[in-house]
Amino acid sequence: MKMLSGSDMVIRSLIDQGIKYIFGYPGGAVLDIYDSLKQMHGIKHILVRHEQSATHMADGYARATGKIGVVLVTSGPGATNSITGIATAYMDSIPLVVISGQVASSLIGYDAFQECDMIGISRPIVKHSFLVKNTEDIPKIFKKAFWLASSGRPGPIVIDLPKDILNPLIKKPYIWPKLISIRSYSPVLQGHQGQIKKALHILIKAKQPIIYIGGGIITSNSHKELKLLAETLNIPVTTSLMALGALPQNHPQNLKMLGMHGTYEANMAIHNADVILAIGVRFDDRTTNNVDKYCPNATIIHIDIDPTSISKTISAHIPIVGHARNVLKQILNLLKNQFSKKNIYNLEHWWKQINCWKSKNSLEYDRKSKKIKPQNVIEIISALTNGNAFVTSDVGQHQMFTALYYSFNKPRRWVNSGGLGTMGYGLPAALGVKLALPKETVLCITGDGSIQMNIQELSTAMQYKLSILILNLNNRSLGMVKQWQDIIYSGRHSHSYMKSLPNFIKLAESYGHIGISIHNPEDLEKKLKLALLKLDQGNLVFVDITIDPEEHVYPMQIRSGGMNEMILRTTEHTSL
């Protein structure tokens, strides 16, 4: 039996869990852990420049790989700096384990130096949290934490470690549990067969069905089963922001993204559907608009592993609790064994209507403009990378342009903060992706507002030689804020302009990277090709692109309207 100190147990537990990377920042309460990390081998630590970035890097790592991201921060400000990243992961169901230092057990509650109640602060935004009270409990708690983070609906876990239990002079028996079970937590993995049969009966008789998929399809690795079901039944598919790439964007049945800035055909199809098969979605406000007007004629079948997500905002007529991949396999097996193609309703008229909506060309824009259009930037970079890059974004117009105009044809290639909408996410997340997948092309598409939130991580990129391509869509403003002010507040621009932007090229160069500026549409493709060439040579390349500051993201749903009520262009509204 091994006798280890608490700090050694932390590192040994991570090694036994198979962890390869930790994203963190040292401080007094965790120096014993950092000393153990120095002396033990098997884990690489990535030193960030801010703890928020540590959580975003771990988040990007987790989204791109499906593995659990690990964060290590000190007590007090180190812990509180990680909160935004934890909330980001929680909203999007991303598995993280965040290890936070804490003051000594005897000092908790006495306002000691760098003390904060990390358990209390993080409680609403974690799947579970642990305050470790005994050194010998460390292996068992770590095993539980990693199982909880990845099982059922994934999410972040916090482990708070008081400094005294890490004491390198006190040795305790180290026992790594082979198995773990928590009696109060047992996710349902298989769908109820009766509910599945009922759902399938309704689905194959539908005249205007649609499959609506969310991030749960990505998390559960269900994209192959989804594609097979959609093709077997010839049903159109629409996606939330989080599900891009689960079904190839160029698939003929993919109506692309729905919701606030979704395509005309996606929003019209779901509004007019008579049956909605929703898989791994939350029905959040960005995808429903006014819930009282939501899809008035639809029977809703909702599949989700989290029973609390079902009927939370939109009531499901047929709820099915289970792991999406398992449930889809159950549906496919039932379809194969009990139904023939002659029983499936002919959807010719439905597809004719959908193709009519598609003819609106809701994503068309001015391609002859003398100013650079952000849509054109995304289309060109998508073509140059064959839609195969891993793409991170921040939040705002650039995020929506990327979602609408980049052709994501594989799952896990789109990495963004969907639920919380976190500015400053894109750069550190891209570094996490690149660390996990060093041979892949990684893009960070951002804006002049968002990039400044965590721009210090250009230093981290240089230290670890992480070569990514940053496309800064620079409109000298907070673009989405300005768009809302244009449309809703009669053009009253209150604090949405950036009047003192840095020289991004010189800033990137000061960190040791390559900077490229683009001002003219005719230079766009040529300079983006150059940027990709420099990227392939192992450089981080920062491309500052001056875009049309007046460009808006369309379509845009009308507030408090139905899914079918949209602004298609500046001069065109529709509720037809």
From Swiss-Prot:
The upper taxonomy is:
Bacteria, Pseudomonadati, Pseudomonadota, Gammaproteobacteria, Enterobacterales
Listed binding positions for FAD are 153, 261-282, 304-323
Reactions catalysed, semicolon-separated, are: 2 pyruvate + H(+) = (2S)-2-acetolactate + CO2
Known pathway: Amino-acid biosynthesis; L-isoleucine biosynthesis; L-isoleucine from 2-oxobutanoate: step 1/4; Amino-acid biosynthesis; L-valine biosynthesis; L-valine from pyruvate: step 1/4
Query: What is the official name of this protein in its record?
Result: Acetolactate synthase large subunit
Q: Per the UniProt record, which EC number(s) apply here?
A: 2.2.1.6
Region Thiamine pyrophosphate binding, residue ranges: 397-477
Any one GO molecular-function label of the UniProt entry:
thiamine pyrophosphate binding
**TM segments?**
none
Q: Which PROSITE patterns match?
A: TPP_ENZYMES
Q: What else is known?
A: Contains 1 molecule of FAD per monomer. The role of this cofactor is not clear considering that the reaction does not involve redox chemistry.
| InterPro entries given in the database record | Acetolactate_synth_lsu, AHAS_TPP, DHS-like_NAD/FAD-binding_dom, THDP-binding, Thiamin_PyroP_enz_cen_dom, Thiamin_PyroP_enz_TPP-bd_dom, TPP-bd_CS, TPP_enz
Co-factor binding comment: Binds 1 Mg(2+) ion per subunit.
Sites where the protein binds Mg(2+): 448, 475
